[in-house]
Regions:
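ATP-dependent adenylation/nucleotidyltransferase module used to activate substrates
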Residues: 12-208, 235
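Hydrophobic alpha-helical signal peptides and transmembrane signal-/tail-anchor segments
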Residues: 1-10
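AMP-forming adenylation/ATP pyrophosphatase catalytic core
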Residues: 25, 36, 160-166, 171-406
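Enriched - but not universal
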Residues: 4, 22, 66, 336-338
C-alpha cells in the first residue's frame, strides 16, 4: 500500500513557525515521473500507478556521444553521464510498457553540456571545486527536462522523482522567521525543502538551487521511506531495478581525463604557505581544497591542499590545522520564495555534502552576497562548493562559496 502523510511540526529561531507537508498526488491526477532506470524512480512510478494516478514516464537523454570510449569499460555503469545511457533508456521504456503507461525520452544534451560539463571544466580550471549535481538539478532535471515534457504537450499536475527529500510550506509569512519587517499585501509562503525520513540518504543539499516556483508541482513520494524499505518494496514487487547498483558520480572516473582533454593541462608548481617549491602538479583540475592523497610530493608529515591559484598555476599545501576557517563569503544565492533576508540571523550551514551543518550567523553584505561566520571553525572551505543554510532541517537558501575567511 502506498501511504500518504500530512503533518505539522515546529522550529524555533526568532519566531515559532508551523510547517505543513505538501500532500502527495491524488488518484486520477496526471503525474510525470523522472525515470533513470534505478530502483528509486522505478518504484515511484509503480507506487503512483498503484495509487490510481495517470502516470507518464520521462527519461532525459544527455549523452552527446562526442567523447572517445575509455581504455577500460570498468566503472562506466553507475554514473549519470556515460555511453551506456541507451541501456537505461531501454530499461525505462520496457518497464513503462509493462505497466501500460506512456514513456518519453527528452533530449537535454545542449542544456547538460552547458550547465554541467562546461561548468564543471571551467570551475576546476579556475581553481574552484564545483558541484555538478547542484547545478544540474535546477537547470536540467528540474529545468530542461520539464521544458521538454511540456513541449510534448504533457500538461502534468505533478512531477515526481525518486529523491529523498520532503517538501513543506510555512503556515505564516517566511519573513517572520528572519525577523524582517512584513510589508505589502502578498504573504511569502513558498514551497521549501526539508530532510526526508532516511537521514543517511538525505538529498536536500543537492536540491538547494531548485526555485520554490518550480517546486510547487514537484513531489517526492519516497520522503517517508528509508532506503531499506524502498528495496524491500521493490523486491516484493519483483522489480529488476532492485538488483541494480546505485549511481555514485555524475561521470565515470575513466572519463575525467577524457573530458579535460579538449585543452592541454599545464603543469605548475606545488608550494607551501611560504612559497617554497615542493613539487610539480599535473594540472590544477586534479586538485581540490583539503585533498591529501595523490599530491605527488614527499614529506615527513601529512600535507593538504590549502588553496589553488589559477593565475599563478600553483597548488598550495599546508598542515591540517591551516585548513580551519572562521567563515566564508558566498554569492549567487537562491533563497526560498526568492526572498533574500535583510536581517542577520542564526542558522546551520552545510559547506559540503559529507559535513554536518555548522551553527553559524548569516549576514547580508549589501551586494547580494552573504557572510557566514561559524560558531566553531570549519575545515577546508572550498570556493565553488555550495553553502546551504538550514533552519531545523529546512533549506532556506543556497549560495556559491566565493572565498573563505580565516
Amino acid at each position: 500500500m502506498f501511504y500518504l502523510f500530512h503533518f505539522i511540526f515546529k522550529t524555533v529561531i526568532f519566531y515559532t513557525m508551523d510547517w505543513e507537508k505538501l500532500s502527495m498526488p491524488e488518484p486520477g491526477s496526471l503525474v510525470a515521473v523522472g525515470m533513470s532506470g534505478g530502483v528509486d524512480s522505478t518504484l515511484v512510478t509503480l507506487l503512483l500507478k498503484e495509487h490510481g494516478c495517470t502516470v507518464v514516464g520521462v527519461t532525459m537523454s544527455s549523452w552527446a556521444n562526442d567523447l572517445p570510449l575509455p581504455p577500460s569499460a570498468e566503472g562506466v555503469r553507475g554514473s549519470c553521464y556515460g555511453p551506456d545511457e541507451a541501456i537505461d533508456i531501454a530499461q525505462c521504456k520496457a518497464f513503462c510498457q509493462q505497466l501500460g503507461i506512456e514513456h518519453h525520452v527528452i533530449d537535454v544534451r545542449e542544456a547538460y553540456h552547458h550547465h554541467v560539463l562546461d561548468y564543471f571544466k571551467a570551475e576546476y580550471r579556475n581553481g574552484r571545486t564545483p558541484n555538478p549535481c547542484i547545478n544540474c538539478n535546477p537547470n536540467v532535471k528540474f529545468g530542461a527536462l520539464l521544458d521538454g515534457v511540456r513541449a510534448k504537450g504533457i500538461d502534468f499536475d505533478y512531477f515526481c522523482t525518486g529523491h529523498y527529500a520532503t517538501l513543506v510550506r510555512p503556515t505564516e509569512d517566511l519573513r517572520l522567521v528572519y525577523g524582517d519587517e512584513v510589508t505589502g499585501q502578498e504573504t511569502v509562503r513558498p514551497v521549501m525543502i526539508s530532510a526526508a525520513t532516511d537521514k543517511r540518504k538525505d538529498q536536500t543539499y543537492f536540491l538547494c538551487r531548485v526555485p520554490s516556483a518550480t517546486l510547487e508541482k514537484v513531489r517526492f513520494p519516497l520522503s517517508v521511506y528509508t532506503k531499506q524499505e524502498v528495496y524491500a518494496m521493490a523486491q516484493e514487487r519483483g522489480l529488476a531495478a532492485a538488483s541494480r547498483s546505485e549511481s555514485q558520480d555524475f561521470i565515470p572516473d575513466t572519463y575525467l581525463d577524457i573530458i579535460f582533454s579538449d585543452q592541454i593541462s599545464q603543469p605548475g608548481d606545488i608550494v607551501d604557505l611560504a612559497g617554497k617549491k615542493l613539487g610539480v602538479h599535473r594540472g590544477i583540475h586534479h586538485y581540490t581544497i583539503g585533498q591529501r592523497r595523490g599530491l605527488g610530493v614527499s614529506s615527513n608529515r601529512p600535507l593538504y591542499v590549502h588553496s589553488i591559484d589559477s593565475q599563478k598555476n600553483q597548488v598550495v599545501l599546508c598542515d591540517d590545522q591551516d585548513l580551519l576557517c572562521s567563515g566564508l563569503v558566498a554569492e549567487n544565492w537562491v533563497w526560498a520564495g526568492g526572498y533574500a533576508p535583510k536581517s542577520s540571523f542564526k542558522g546551520q550551514v552545510k559547506i559540503r555534502l559529507a559535513s554536518p551543518a555548522a551553527s553559524s550567523t548569516i549576514r547580508a553584505r549589501g551586494d547580494g552576497s552573504y557572510e557566514i561566520i561559524f560558531d566553531q571553525p570549519q575545515r577546508a572551505v572550498a570556493p565553488g562548493q555550495s553553502a546551504v543554510v538550514y533552519l531545523d532541517g529546512i533549506i532556506f537558501g543556497g549560495g556559491i562559496i566565493s572565498r573563505e575567511i580565516r
